Amino acid sequence: MEHLTLGPLTRATGTVRLPGSKSISNRVLLLAALANGETRVRDLLDSDDTRVMLQALRTLGVAWRQDGPDYIVTGAGGNFPVKSAELFMGNAGTAIRPLTAALALQGGSYKLSGVPRMHERPIGDLVDGLRQVGAVIDYLGNEGFPPLHIQPASLRIDAPIRVRGDVSSQFLTALLMSLPLAQSASGRIEIEVVGELISKPYIEITLNLLARFGIEVERQGWERFILPAGTAYRSPGEIFVEGDASSASYFLAAGAIGGGPVRVEGVGMASIQGDVRFADALNRMGANVMAGDNWIEVRGTERDDGRLHGIELDCNHIPDAAMTLAVAALFAEGTTTLTNIASWRVKETDRIAAMATELRKLGAVVEEGADYLRVTPPQPWQTPADGIGTYDDHRMAMCFSLAAFGPLPVRINDPGCVAKTFPDYFSVFAGVTR
Protein backbone atom coordinates (compact mmCIF):
# COMPACT_ATOMS: atom_id res chain seq x y z
CA MET A 1 0.00 0.00 0.00
CA GLU A 2 1.21 3.50 -0.81
CA HIS A 3 2.03 5.54 2.28
CA LEU A 4 3.55 8.85 3.34
CA THR A 5 5.65 9.43 6.47
CA LEU A 6 5.42 12.87 8.07
CA GLY A 7 7.27 14.57 10.93
CA PRO A 8 8.02 15.03 13.59
CA LEU A 9 7.05 18.64 12.83
CA THR A 10 7.75 21.55 15.16
CA ARG A 11 6.53 24.65 13.36
CA ALA A 12 3.75 25.88 11.07
CA THR A 13 3.77 29.28 9.41
CA GLY A 14 2.71 30.70 6.05
CA THR A 15 -0.25 31.49 3.80
CA VAL A 16 -2.50 29.05 1.94
CA ARG A 17 -4.82 29.88 -0.95
CA LEU A 18 -7.65 27.40 -0.54
CA PRO A 19 -9.17 25.23 -3.28
CA GLY A 20 -12.84 25.81 -4.03
CA SER A 21 -15.52 24.50 -1.70
CA LYS A 22 -16.81 21.04 -2.61
CA SER A 23 -20.26 21.78 -1.20
CA ILE A 24 -20.58 24.99 -3.19
CA SER A 25 -18.95 23.61 -6.36
CA ASN A 26 -21.36 20.72 -6.93
CA ARG A 27 -24.41 22.79 -5.99
CA VAL A 28 -23.38 25.52 -8.44
CA LEU A 29 -22.76 23.02 -11.24
CA LEU A 30 -26.22 21.48 -10.91
CA LEU A 31 -28.00 24.83 -10.58
CA ALA A 32 -26.12 26.16 -13.61
CA ALA A 33 -27.10 23.04 -15.55
CA LEU A 34 -30.78 23.49 -14.64
CA ALA A 35 -30.85 27.25 -15.28
CA ASN A 36 -31.70 29.29 -18.33
CA GLY A 37 -28.62 30.91 -19.81
CA GLU A 38 -24.88 30.49 -19.60
CA THR A 39 -22.98 30.56 -16.30
CA ARG A 40 -19.27 31.22 -15.91
CA VAL A 41 -18.07 29.40 -12.78
CA ARG A 42 -14.87 30.78 -11.30
CA ASP A 43 -12.60 28.96 -8.82
CA LEU A 44 -14.43 25.65 -9.19
CA LEU A 45 -12.86 22.88 -7.13
CA ASP A 46 -10.86 20.45 -9.26
CA SER A 47 -11.32 17.08 -7.55
CA ASP A 48 -12.77 13.60 -7.94
CA ASP A 49 -16.20 14.70 -6.65
CA THR A 50 -16.58 17.63 -9.03
CA ARG A 51 -15.36 15.54 -11.95
CA VAL A 52 -18.10 13.02 -11.13
CA MET A 53 -20.72 15.78 -11.33
CA LEU A 54 -19.27 17.27 -14.52
CA GLN A 55 -19.22 13.87 -16.23
CA ALA A 56 -22.80 13.14 -15.15
CA LEU A 57 -24.01 16.47 -16.52
CA ARG A 58 -22.26 15.86 -19.83
CA THR A 59 -23.84 12.39 -20.05
CA LEU A 60 -27.23 14.05 -19.49
CA GLY A 61 -26.62 16.34 -22.45
CA VAL A 62 -25.59 19.48 -20.58
CA ALA A 63 -22.91 21.41 -22.46
CA TRP A 64 -19.95 22.79 -20.54
CA ARG A 65 -16.44 23.81 -21.46
CA GLN A 66 -13.31 25.10 -19.81
CA ASP A 67 -12.08 28.60 -20.52
CA GLY A 68 -8.72 28.84 -18.82
CA PRO A 69 -9.37 28.19 -15.11
CA ASP A 70 -13.11 28.87 -15.49
CA TYR A 71 -15.95 26.53 -16.41
CA ILE A 72 -18.75 27.76 -18.65
CA VAL A 73 -22.00 25.82 -18.29
CA THR A 74 -24.83 26.19 -20.80
CA GLY A 75 -28.04 25.66 -18.87
CA ALA A 76 -30.66 23.19 -20.05
CA GLY A 77 -33.59 25.29 -18.85
CA GLY A 78 -34.73 22.68 -16.36
CA ASN A 79 -34.96 19.91 -18.96
CA PHE A 80 -32.00 17.58 -19.51
CA PRO A 81 -31.77 16.58 -23.19
CA VAL A 82 -30.87 12.93 -22.49
CA LYS A 83 -33.80 10.90 -21.14
CA SER A 84 -32.08 7.56 -20.57
CA ALA A 85 -28.68 7.17 -18.95
CA GLU A 86 -26.56 5.20 -16.53
CA LEU A 87 -24.54 7.43 -14.21
CA PHE A 88 -21.58 6.44 -12.03
CA MET A 89 -21.41 8.74 -9.00
CA GLY A 90 -18.26 7.47 -7.28
CA ASN A 91 -18.57 8.26 -3.57
CA ALA A 92 -19.87 11.80 -4.08
CA GLY A 93 -22.86 12.37 -1.82
CA THR A 94 -23.01 16.00 -2.98
CA ALA A 95 -23.61 14.67 -6.50
CA ILE A 96 -25.85 11.61 -6.19
CA ARG A 97 -28.41 13.06 -3.78
CA PRO A 98 -29.24 16.34 -5.59
CA LEU A 99 -29.11 14.57 -8.96
CA THR A 100 -31.54 11.90 -7.75
CA ALA A 101 -34.12 14.58 -6.99
CA ALA A 102 -33.45 16.52 -10.20
CA LEU A 103 -33.72 13.39 -12.35
CA ALA A 104 -37.00 12.37 -10.71
CA LEU A 105 -38.54 15.43 -12.40
CA GLN A 106 -37.12 14.71 -15.86
CA GLY A 107 -39.58 12.07 -17.05
CA GLY A 108 -36.76 9.75 -18.06
CA SER A 109 -35.13 6.46 -17.11
CA TYR A 110 -31.90 6.78 -15.16
CA LYS A 111 -29.72 4.37 -13.20
CA LEU A 112 -27.36 5.78 -10.56
CA SER A 113 -24.61 3.77 -8.90
CA GLY A 114 -21.30 4.35 -7.16
CA VAL A 115 -18.39 2.72 -5.39
CA PRO A 116 -19.19 0.02 -2.79
CA ARG A 117 -19.17 2.56 0.07
CA MET A 118 -21.74 4.70 -1.76
CA HIS A 119 -24.03 1.67 -1.75
CA GLU A 120 -23.80 1.72 2.07
CA ARG A 121 -24.70 5.41 2.43
CA PRO A 122 -28.42 6.01 3.07
CA ILE A 123 -30.68 7.67 0.53
CA GLY A 124 -34.02 6.19 1.63
CA ASP A 125 -35.35 9.36 3.28
CA LEU A 126 -34.87 11.30 0.04
CA VAL A 127 -36.49 8.54 -2.03
CA ASP A 128 -39.43 8.45 0.40
CA GLY A 129 -39.88 12.20 -0.01
CA LEU A 130 -39.86 11.95 -3.79
CA ARG A 131 -42.25 8.99 -3.79
CA GLN A 132 -44.75 11.14 -1.86
CA VAL A 133 -45.21 13.26 -4.99
CA GLY A 134 -45.38 10.40 -7.47
CA ALA A 135 -41.75 9.67 -8.32
CA VAL A 136 -41.07 6.06 -9.35
CA ILE A 137 -37.71 5.02 -7.91
CA ASP A 138 -36.56 1.43 -7.44
CA TYR A 139 -33.68 0.13 -5.37
CA LEU A 140 -31.38 -2.13 -7.37
CA GLY A 141 -29.61 -3.46 -4.27
CA ASN A 142 -30.45 -3.03 -0.60
CA GLU A 143 -33.61 -1.16 0.36
CA GLY A 144 -32.81 2.44 1.29
CA PHE A 145 -29.44 2.59 -0.46
CA PRO A 146 -28.04 3.11 -3.96
CA PRO A 147 -27.88 1.90 -6.68
CA LEU A 148 -31.19 3.37 -7.90
CA HIS A 149 -33.38 3.18 -10.98
CA ILE A 150 -35.45 6.32 -11.58
CA GLN A 151 -38.33 5.70 -13.99
CA PRO A 152 -40.55 8.09 -15.97
CA ALA A 153 -43.31 9.58 -13.84
CA SER A 154 -45.56 12.61 -13.61
CA LEU A 155 -45.11 14.31 -10.27
CA ARG A 156 -48.15 15.73 -8.50
CA ILE A 157 -47.67 18.03 -5.55
CA ASP A 158 -50.86 18.77 -3.66
CA ALA A 159 -49.69 18.45 -0.05
CA PRO A 160 -46.58 19.25 2.01
CA ILE A 161 -43.63 16.94 1.39
CA ARG A 162 -42.19 15.44 4.54
CA VAL A 163 -38.50 14.56 4.80
CA ARG A 164 -36.35 13.50 7.72
CA GLY A 165 -33.61 15.89 8.72
CA ASP A 166 -31.73 13.87 11.34
CA VAL A 167 -29.59 11.64 9.08
CA SER A 168 -28.26 14.00 6.42
CA SER A 169 -29.08 17.57 5.44
CA GLN A 170 -28.35 16.59 1.82
CA PHE A 171 -31.83 15.07 1.50
CA LEU A 172 -33.42 18.46 2.19
CA THR A 173 -30.86 20.20 -0.03
CA ALA A 174 -31.77 17.85 -2.89
CA LEU A 175 -35.47 18.68 -2.60
CA LEU A 176 -34.85 22.42 -2.28
CA MET A 177 -32.68 22.42 -5.41
CA SER A 178 -35.08 20.48 -7.64
CA LEU A 179 -38.69 21.04 -6.57
CA PRO A 180 -38.99 24.66 -7.81
CA LEU A 181 -39.10 23.06 -11.28
CA ALA A 182 -42.19 21.03 -10.36
CA GLN A 183 -45.80 22.10 -10.85
CA SER A 184 -48.31 22.64 -8.07
CA ALA A 185 -51.93 23.77 -8.34
CA SER A 186 -51.37 26.21 -5.48
CA GLY A 187 -48.31 27.74 -7.11
CA ARG A 188 -46.13 26.84 -4.16
CA ILE A 189 -44.50 23.80 -2.63
CA GLU A 190 -44.07 23.11 1.07
CA ILE A 191 -41.39 20.90 2.59
CA GLU A 192 -41.76 19.83 6.22
CA VAL A 193 -38.71 18.58 8.10
CA VAL A 194 -39.35 15.64 10.41
CA GLY A 195 -37.08 15.46 13.45
CA GLU A 196 -34.10 17.64 14.31
CA LEU A 197 -32.41 19.09 11.23
CA ILE A 198 -28.66 18.47 11.41
CA SER A 199 -25.93 20.42 9.62
CA LYS A 200 -28.06 23.56 9.26
CA PRO A 201 -25.17 25.62 7.79
CA TYR A 202 -25.23 23.40 4.71
CA ILE A 203 -28.90 24.29 4.20
CA GLU A 204 -27.93 27.95 4.48
CA ILE A 205 -25.43 27.39 1.64
CA THR A 206 -28.21 25.86 -0.45
CA LEU A 207 -30.64 28.72 0.21
CA ASN A 208 -27.97 31.32 -0.55
CA LEU A 209 -27.10 29.71 -3.88
CA LEU A 210 -30.75 29.24 -4.86
CA ALA A 211 -31.21 32.98 -4.37
CA ARG A 212 -28.26 33.61 -6.69
CA PHE A 213 -30.15 31.64 -9.35
CA GLY A 214 -33.39 33.54 -8.79
CA ILE A 215 -35.19 31.20 -6.38
CA GLU A 216 -36.31 32.76 -3.10
CA VAL A 217 -37.27 30.22 -0.44
CA GLU A 218 -39.36 31.18 2.58
CA ARG A 219 -37.98 29.50 5.69
CA GLN A 220 -40.22 29.10 8.75
CA GLY A 221 -37.76 28.14 11.43
CA TRP A 222 -35.96 24.97 10.42
CA GLU A 223 -39.18 22.96 10.22
CA ARG A 224 -40.88 24.31 7.09
CA PHE A 225 -39.65 25.61 3.74
CA ILE A 226 -41.94 27.17 1.12
CA LEU A 227 -40.79 27.25 -2.50
CA PRO A 228 -42.28 28.79 -5.63
CA ALA A 229 -43.56 26.09 -8.01
CA GLY A 230 -42.99 25.92 -11.76
CA THR A 231 -40.13 28.38 -11.59
CA ALA A 232 -37.28 28.83 -14.06
CA TYR A 233 -33.79 29.19 -12.65
CA ARG A 234 -31.95 32.25 -13.97
CA SER A 235 -28.21 32.19 -14.45
CA PRO A 236 -26.39 34.93 -12.52
CA GLY A 237 -24.01 35.08 -15.48
CA GLU A 238 -20.94 34.63 -13.33
CA ILE A 239 -20.45 33.05 -9.93
CA PHE A 240 -17.38 32.64 -7.74
CA VAL A 241 -16.82 29.52 -5.62
CA GLU A 242 -15.49 30.30 -2.15
CA GLY A 243 -12.48 28.47 -0.79
CA ASP A 244 -13.33 25.27 1.07
CA ALA A 245 -13.84 26.07 4.75
CA SER A 246 -13.57 22.40 5.74
CA SER A 247 -10.16 22.22 4.06
CA ALA A 248 -9.17 25.44 5.83
CA SER A 249 -9.52 23.66 9.17
CA TYR A 250 -6.33 21.60 8.76
CA PHE A 251 -4.14 24.64 8.17
CA LEU A 252 -5.80 26.69 10.91
CA ALA A 253 -5.29 23.82 13.35
CA ALA A 254 -1.66 23.58 12.23
CA GLY A 255 -1.26 27.25 13.13
CA ALA A 256 -2.75 26.62 16.56
CA ILE A 257 -0.57 23.57 17.23
CA GLY A 258 2.61 24.68 15.44
CA GLY A 259 2.74 28.27 16.64
CA GLY A 260 1.75 30.05 13.45
CA PRO A 261 0.87 32.42 12.11
CA VAL A 262 -0.92 30.44 9.42
CA ARG A 263 -3.32 32.36 7.19
CA VAL A 264 -5.88 30.87 4.82
CA GLU A 265 -7.25 32.95 1.96
CA GLY A 266 -10.53 32.31 0.18
CA VAL A 267 -12.85 32.18 3.20
CA GLY A 268 -13.45 34.60 6.04
CA MET A 269 -16.13 36.49 7.92
CA ALA A 270 -18.15 37.00 4.71
CA SER A 271 -18.30 33.25 3.96
CA ILE A 272 -21.60 31.43 3.44
CA GLN A 273 -20.04 28.23 4.87
CA GLY A 274 -20.70 27.21 8.45
CA ASP A 275 -17.31 25.54 8.79
CA VAL A 276 -15.60 28.94 9.09
CA ARG A 277 -16.81 28.78 12.70
CA PHE A 278 -14.14 26.14 13.25
CA ALA A 279 -11.87 29.09 14.05
CA ASP A 280 -14.13 29.93 17.01
CA ALA A 281 -13.53 26.43 18.40
CA LEU A 282 -9.75 26.91 18.11
CA ASN A 283 -10.13 30.21 19.93
CA ARG A 284 -11.99 28.43 22.73
CA MET A 285 -9.08 25.98 22.92
CA GLY A 286 -6.72 28.90 23.51
CA ALA A 287 -5.47 29.74 20.02
CA ASN A 288 -5.27 33.34 18.81
CA VAL A 289 -7.56 34.03 15.85
CA MET A 290 -7.83 37.00 13.50
CA ALA A 291 -10.11 37.27 10.46
CA GLY A 292 -11.20 39.51 7.62
CA ASP A 293 -13.93 39.12 5.02
CA ASN A 294 -11.85 36.71 2.93
CA TRP A 295 -9.12 35.40 5.25
CA ILE A 296 -8.55 33.80 8.65
CA GLU A 297 -5.27 33.66 10.55
CA VAL A 298 -4.40 31.54 13.58
CA ARG A 299 -1.47 31.63 15.98
CA GLY A 300 -0.70 29.34 18.88
CA THR A 301 -1.69 29.81 22.49
CA GLU A 302 0.00 32.29 24.83
CA ARG A 303 0.76 29.52 27.33
CA ASP A 304 4.42 28.89 28.06
CA ASP A 305 4.12 25.23 27.10
CA GLY A 306 2.24 26.10 23.90
CA ARG A 307 -0.54 23.62 24.64
CA LEU A 308 -4.17 24.11 23.81
CA HIS A 309 -6.82 23.10 26.34
CA GLY A 310 -9.65 20.64 25.93
CA ILE A 311 -13.23 21.77 25.34
CA GLU A 312 -16.71 20.33 25.07
CA LEU A 313 -18.46 21.36 21.86
CA ASP A 314 -21.77 20.73 20.11
CA CYS A 315 -20.54 20.25 16.54
CA ASN A 316 -23.84 20.36 14.65
CA HIS A 317 -22.74 23.63 13.02
CA ILE A 318 -19.33 22.31 11.83
CA PRO A 319 -19.82 18.59 11.10
CA ASP A 320 -16.90 18.15 8.68
CA ALA A 321 -14.43 20.53 10.31
CA ALA A 322 -15.16 18.99 13.71
CA MET A 323 -13.11 15.97 12.65
CA THR A 324 -10.05 18.20 12.74
CA LEU A 325 -10.77 19.04 16.38
CA ALA A 326 -10.58 15.35 17.26
CA VAL A 327 -6.93 15.27 16.15
CA ALA A 328 -6.17 18.74 17.54
CA ALA A 329 -7.34 17.30 20.88
CA LEU A 330 -4.11 15.26 20.95
CA PHE A 331 -2.29 18.54 21.65
CA ALA A 332 -4.66 19.88 24.30
CA GLU A 333 -4.45 19.66 28.06
CA GLY A 334 -7.38 17.67 29.38
CA THR A 335 -10.21 15.96 27.57
CA THR A 336 -12.06 17.20 24.49
CA THR A 337 -15.65 16.09 23.92
CA LEU A 338 -17.35 16.48 20.54
CA THR A 339 -21.13 15.97 20.52
CA ASN A 340 -23.95 15.93 17.97
CA ILE A 341 -21.79 14.20 15.33
CA ALA A 342 -24.07 11.27 14.44
CA SER A 343 -23.84 12.25 10.75
CA TRP A 344 -20.18 11.14 10.80
CA ARG A 345 -21.37 7.52 10.76
CA VAL A 346 -22.89 7.79 7.25
CA LYS A 347 -20.11 9.72 5.53
CA GLU A 348 -17.30 8.35 3.33
CA THR A 349 -16.68 5.90 6.16
CA ASP A 350 -18.06 5.52 9.70
CA ARG A 351 -15.97 8.46 10.85
CA ILE A 352 -16.68 8.07 14.56
CA ALA A 353 -15.43 4.48 14.58
CA ALA A 354 -12.52 5.23 12.25
CA MET A 355 -11.39 8.29 14.20
CA ALA A 356 -11.56 6.42 17.52
CA THR A 357 -9.56 3.49 16.13
CA GLU A 358 -6.76 5.62 14.70
CA LEU A 359 -6.50 7.99 17.67
CA ARG A 360 -6.09 4.98 19.95
CA LYS A 361 -3.18 3.80 17.79
CA LEU A 362 -1.37 7.01 18.77
CA GLY A 363 -1.97 6.32 22.46
CA ALA A 364 -5.01 8.53 23.04
CA VAL A 365 -7.78 7.43 25.38
CA VAL A 366 -10.99 7.59 23.33
CA GLU A 367 -14.61 7.05 24.25
CA GLU A 368 -17.11 6.84 21.40
CA GLY A 369 -20.88 6.89 21.45
CA ALA A 370 -23.66 6.96 18.90
CA ASP A 371 -23.22 10.70 18.39
CA TYR A 372 -20.17 11.76 20.39
CA LEU A 373 -16.41 11.32 20.73
CA ARG A 374 -14.32 12.00 23.84
CA VAL A 375 -10.54 12.30 23.41
CA THR A 376 -7.82 12.45 26.08
CA PRO A 377 -4.24 13.00 24.79
CA PRO A 378 -1.64 10.20 24.71
CA GLN A 379 0.53 9.51 27.74
CA PRO A 380 2.92 8.58 26.21
CA TRP A 381 2.67 8.95 22.43
CA GLN A 382 2.85 5.80 20.35
CA THR A 383 3.64 5.24 16.69
CA PRO A 384 1.69 2.40 15.05
CA ALA A 385 3.83 0.08 12.95
CA ASP A 386 1.01 -0.36 10.44
CA GLY A 387 0.48 3.38 10.06
CA ILE A 388 -2.72 5.41 10.19
CA GLY A 389 -5.59 3.91 8.24
CA THR A 390 -7.49 6.38 6.08
CA TYR A 391 -10.46 4.21 5.00
CA ASP A 392 -10.54 5.75 1.50
CA ASP A 393 -11.71 8.92 3.28
CA HIS A 394 -10.03 12.16 2.28
CA ARG A 395 -10.77 13.86 5.59
CA MET A 396 -9.22 11.07 7.64
CA ALA A 397 -5.96 11.49 5.70
CA MET A 398 -5.92 15.27 6.02
CA CYS A 399 -6.88 15.28 9.71
CA PHE A 400 -4.12 12.87 10.69
CA SER A 401 -1.43 14.91 8.94
CA LEU A 402 -1.66 17.04 12.10
CA ALA A 403 -0.49 14.09 14.21
CA ALA A 404 2.95 14.76 12.72
CA PHE A 405 3.30 17.59 15.26
CA GLY A 406 3.68 14.91 17.92
CA PRO A 407 7.08 13.66 19.13
CA LEU A 408 7.17 10.71 16.71
CA PRO A 409 6.85 10.35 12.93
CA VAL A 410 3.44 9.30 11.63
CA ARG A 411 2.77 7.18 8.55
CA ILE A 412 -0.36 7.99 6.55
CA ASN A 413 -1.64 5.05 4.50
CA ASP A 414 -3.18 5.66 1.06
CA PRO A 415 -2.52 9.42 1.05
CA GLY A 416 -3.86 9.60 -2.51
CA CYS A 417 -7.43 9.43 -1.18
CA VAL A 418 -7.25 13.22 -0.69
CA ALA A 419 -7.92 13.52 -4.45
CA LYS A 420 -11.63 13.47 -3.58
CA THR A 421 -11.47 17.15 -2.59
CA PHE A 422 -7.84 18.39 -2.34
CA PRO A 423 -5.46 16.51 -4.68
CA ASP A 424 -2.32 18.47 -3.75
CA TYR A 425 -3.06 18.69 -0.02
CA PHE A 426 0.17 17.13 1.21
CA SER A 427 2.40 19.38 -0.90
CA VAL A 428 0.52 22.46 0.31
CA PHE A 429 0.75 21.19 3.90
CA ALA A 430 4.51 20.68 3.48
CA GLY A 431 4.79 24.28 2.29
CA VAL A 432 3.67 25.70 5.65
CA THR A 433 5.23 23.18 8.06
CA ARG A 434 8.71 22.17 9.11
From Swiss-Prot:
Active site: 320
Pathway assigned in UniProt: Metabolic intermediate biosynthesis; chorismate biosynthesis; chorismate from D-erythrose 4-phosphate and phosphoenolpyruvate: step 6/7
Listed GO biological process terms: amino acid biosynthetic process; aromatic amino acid family biosynthetic process; chorismate biosynthetic process
Gene Ontology molecular function: any one: 3-phosphoshikimate 1-carboxyvinyltransferase activity
Entry GO terms, CC: cytoplasm
Binding site for phosphoenolpyruvate: 22, 93, 121, 170, 351, 395, 420
The name this protein goes by in its record: 3-phosphoshikimate 1-carboxyvinyltransferase
Species this chain originates from: Cupriavidus taiwanensis (strain DSM 17343 / BCRC 17206 / CCUG 44338 / CIP 107171 / LMG 19424 / R1) (Ralstonia taiwanensis (strain LMG 19424))
Gene name for this UniProt entry: aroA
